[in-house]
Amino acid sequence: MAAVDSFYLLYREIARSCNCYIEALALVGAWYTARKSITVVCDFYSLIRLHFIPRLVSRADLIKQYGRWAVVSGATDGIGRAYAEELASRGLNIVLISRSQEKLQMVAKDIADTYKVETDIIVADFSSGREIYDMIREALQDRDIGILVNNVGVFYPYPQYFTQVSEDTLWDIVNVNIAAASLMVHIVLPGMVERKKGAIVTISSGSCCKPTPQLAAFSASKAYLDHFSRALQYEYASKGIFVQSLIPFYVATNVATPGSFLHKCPWLVPSPKVYAHHAVSTLGISKRTTGYWSHSIQFLFAQYMPEWLWVWGANILNRSLRKEALSCKA
């Protein structure tokens, strides 16, 4: 009995001496909870401010804000074409750049007829290296370029392990995903700085959020574009230039395999037209955004989840996409 009493007294003494530590831990827990709560509220406010409020107010005058002409690379399909059409719907004249003259002429005519704006085309294969840029520079030199959209890019035929990717594809990723955006900015930025206004939109990818297995080179090239855009914003914001890093997740383009299960979730995987309509409304508001409300929710989850969980999910998704692509080939 005496032993029990002694233990009870000892326990009380230890508990009394630990009270200050328990209170300190409670304060730390309260601070952490408050901080996370404030972060969630701020993220929710940002989501509303970016993706819903702009749809309730009158559209910004992009011509007055940036200039009369927009240049869109990779403009004959997918996000590039949809973005060009959305800018044209707001009255901007469009210079379309892509490698297929036939497609360029068709898209340029469609845009001119539908939106009653001027269009021009530049036939350029960005995978051919530096030789095309003098021609592009000459074609754009007399234009009042207000907006540059760096959309052109190449993707793997389907998710693959790095050693399975061909050397040609790796060179295309360097030349098209990385070099094209860098050199297009180098061409148009001096004119924007001289006029003290302009916008540069560079389309990265949600795969740049964290290391993405089976898309190693592609996701790394998109991470370059994200960091490049953010650094440019810091360099040139004081000169009147708005630089936006656009980080879409899956959009229903050729990148998401036609017939894929991804196309069955339109609220999660929007059409290029829907995506571009939302993305353009964020221009001038957010320097770094996914461009679409459900993608912003995905981006928030990606930011907060541990890297191992991202890698696990990416492996499952990319294995499914590879299996589906290979079964379609068979």
UniProtKB/Swiss-Prot annotation:
Primary location class: mitochondrion
The entry's keywords: Acetylation, Mitochondrion, NADP
Binding site for NADP(+): G74, A75, T76, D77, G78, I79, G80, D125, K222
UniProt modified residues of type N-acetylalanine: A2
Subcellular localization(s) per the UniProt record: Mitochondrion
Membrane spanning residue stretches: none
Pfam families found in the cross-reference section: adh_short
InterPro entries: 17-beta-HSD3-like, NAD(P)-bd_dom_sf, SDR_fam
This protein's GO CC annotations: mitochondrion
Chain spans, region Required for mitochondria translocation: 2-82
PANTHER family per the UniProt record, alphabetical: INACTIVE HYDROXYSTEROID DEHYDROGENASE-LIKE PROTEIN 1
Family named by the database record: Belongs to the short-chain dehydrogenases/reductases (SDR) family. 17-beta-HSD 3 subfamily.
Assembly with partners or alone: Interacts with STYXL1.
The protein's name: Inactive hydroxysteroid dehydrogenase-like protein 1
Organism ancestry: Eukaryota, Metazoa, Chordata, Craniata, Vertebrata
